[in-house]
């Protein structure tokens, strides 16, 4: 059995959160009743080190609402693992900035989902979130910490993209744009992007990438943003080739109660086990993840697509959100381009 290396793990340390974001796939707010203890979480951190994980993203909920987060992060860093700390940036204090500096993380990630306070705060569910986030970004950068921003798109904020671009331009902030899935309870399915709206967002990213140099606006589409387009050559990073979704192949997600999935964004029926019952090594090298590393059974358009063997139906989360199954992804630029609108 050929066991791949673990490129990336996204670890939800707690579901507790001080915001109530509309698109949150985990419907974060209150902590899970059975979250890992510090002792259990430290064991998981040791196992990630033993697995030689390249990078671990620590997040919530809101990570700063779990008091032992610095100890867990230090354990990973001491083991040679790159750490990304993802926070909504509304609870940043001088003490936390000092903790982050000592940690030497790869990136501090945060979210901006609107180009002004009114739109951002409506989506994030709490007033003044926008102002606090921008102030925190300034404070983090002033201390030499690298900041990245994610914008999660729904029909509610699609047309905020130009305003967000103006906000981030020239600030040395890496910007990732991604589409919302349907995992949470706060977002209506009617608020999910349609395929053409998804394509519009891609056109916008591609235009930014050809208009502004990377030093001015380093923007990318997340890996859910398109495969095998015949028209959007500037969308992806040069040299980047899509070879199928990494969920369960070279990435995994850990929930705050120890449940493990190939990707943290996938719904609960994709849980493959729990670290309280099996070690991460046993799960990673076991039969369940081995099944994820086999070729994906493709359906519908993807079954006959000339790119299907390499692409395998794109992002698993979006495929499941829009078609209910792996290997059938309506949110595919090649598929959209083959529709009558483009013929």
Located regions from the model:
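Short Fe-S-cluster ligation motifs
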Residues: 47-60, 329-343
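Accessory C-terminal segments flanking Radical SAM cores
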Residues: 173, 223-340
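Short beta->alpha junction loops/turns
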Residues: 14, 29, 62, 89-90, ...
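Radical SAM enzyme [4Fe-4S]-AdoMet core and its adjacent flexible, acidic
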Residues: 36, 102-106, 111-113, 118-247, ...
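Hydrophobic/aromatic residues in well-formed alpha-helices
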Residues: 41, 198-201, 280
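Conserved alpha-helical substructure of the radical SAM core
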Residues: 1-107
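Residues that scaffold the ATP/ADP-binding catalytic core of kinase and kinase-like folds
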Residues: 20, 24, 66, 95, ...
């Amino acid at each position: 059995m050929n066991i791949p290396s673990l490129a990336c793990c996204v670890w939800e340390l707690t579901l507790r959160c001080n915001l109530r974001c509309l698109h949150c796939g985990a419907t974060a707010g209150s902590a899970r009743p059975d979250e890992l203890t510090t002792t259990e979480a430290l064991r998981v951190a040791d196992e990630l080190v033993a697995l030689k994980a390249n990078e671990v993203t620590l997040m919530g909920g809101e990570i700063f609402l779990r008091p032992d987060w610095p100890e867990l992060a230090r354990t990973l860093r001491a083991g040679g693992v790159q750490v990304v700390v993802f926070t909504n940036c509304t609870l940043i204090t001088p003490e936390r900035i000092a903790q982050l500096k000592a940690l030497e993380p790869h990136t501090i990630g945060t979210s901006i989902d609107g180009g002004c306070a009114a739109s951002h705060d409506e989506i994030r569910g709490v007033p003044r979130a926008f102002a606090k986030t921008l102030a925190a970004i300034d404070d983090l950068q002033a201390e030499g910490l690298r900041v990245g921003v994610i914008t999660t798109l729904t029909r509610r904020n699609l047309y905020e993209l130009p305003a967000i671009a103006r906000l981030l331009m020239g600030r040395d902030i890496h910007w990732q744009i991604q589409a919302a899935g349907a995992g949470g309870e706060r977002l209506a399915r009617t608020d999910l992007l349609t395929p053409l709206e998804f394509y519009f967002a891609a056109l916008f990213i591609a235009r930014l990438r050809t208009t502004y140099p990377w030093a001015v606006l380093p923007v990318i589409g997340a890996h859910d943003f398109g495969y095998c387009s015949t028209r959007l050559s500037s969308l992806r990073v040069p040299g980047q080739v899509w070879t199928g979704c990494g969920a369960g192949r070279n990435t995994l997600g850990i929930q705050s109660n120890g449940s493990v999935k190939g990707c943290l964004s996938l719904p609960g029926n994709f849980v493959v086990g729990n670290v309280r019952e099996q070690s991460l090594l046993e799960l990673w090298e076991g039969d369940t993840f081995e099944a994820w590393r086999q070729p994906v059974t493709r359906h519908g358009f993807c079954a006959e697509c000339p790119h299907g063997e390499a692409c395998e139906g794109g992002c698993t989360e979006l495929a499941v959100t829009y078609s209910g199954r792996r290997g059938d992804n309506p949110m595919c630029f090649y598929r959209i381009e083959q529709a009558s609108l483009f013929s």
